[in-house]
From Swiss-Prot:
Official protein name in the record: Small ribosomal subunit protein uS8
rRNA-binding found in the keyword field: yes
One GO molecular-function entry: structural constituent of ribosome
Gene Ontology biological process: translation
Keyword rRNA-binding assigned: yes
Length: 130
């Protein structure tokens, strides 16, 4: 049985790992997951990430905590395999009035909603992180 939505699985592993106060979570790696992890690291939601293994690469995310509380308060999948959500540059949402981020897959790669607005790009909204 193959996994239907690997990105939702990644987000769930992050959510569950932080709820259980884990230091790190591992998952099967892909280019899109690495790109999402890179955005989360740049925005300060995770400490670090690394890819290990040649035949079956594993992505390991080091989770981030501040004063014993998880940095990621909520992480929510938006576009899913059964219902893709695309937005034009003018329609890009602001998560929690700008306090959170929307991770967006554009023609220039995966980036935050702020970066997409500055670049004048729309795309598929992968998830909201706050």
């Amino acid at each position: 049985m193959s996994m239907q939505d690997p990105i939702a699985d990644m987000l769930t592993r992050i959510r569950n790992g932080q709820a259980a106060n884990k230091a790190a979570v591992t998952m099967p790696s892909s280019k899109l997951k690495v790109a999402i992890a890179n955005v989360l690291k740049e925005e300060g939601f995770i400490e670090d990430f690394k890819v290990e293994g040649d035949t079956k690469p594993e992505l390991e995310l080091t989770l981030k905590y501040f004063q014993g509380k998880a940095v990621v308060e909520s992480i929510q999948r938006v576009s899913r395999p059964g219902l893709r959500i695309y937005k034009k540059k003018d329609e890009l949402p602001k998560v929690m009035a700008g306090l959170g981020i929307a991770v967006i897959s554009t023609s220039k790669g995966v980036m935050t909603d702020r970066a997409a607005r500055q670049a004048g790009l729309g795309g598929e909204i992968i998830c909201y992180v706050a």
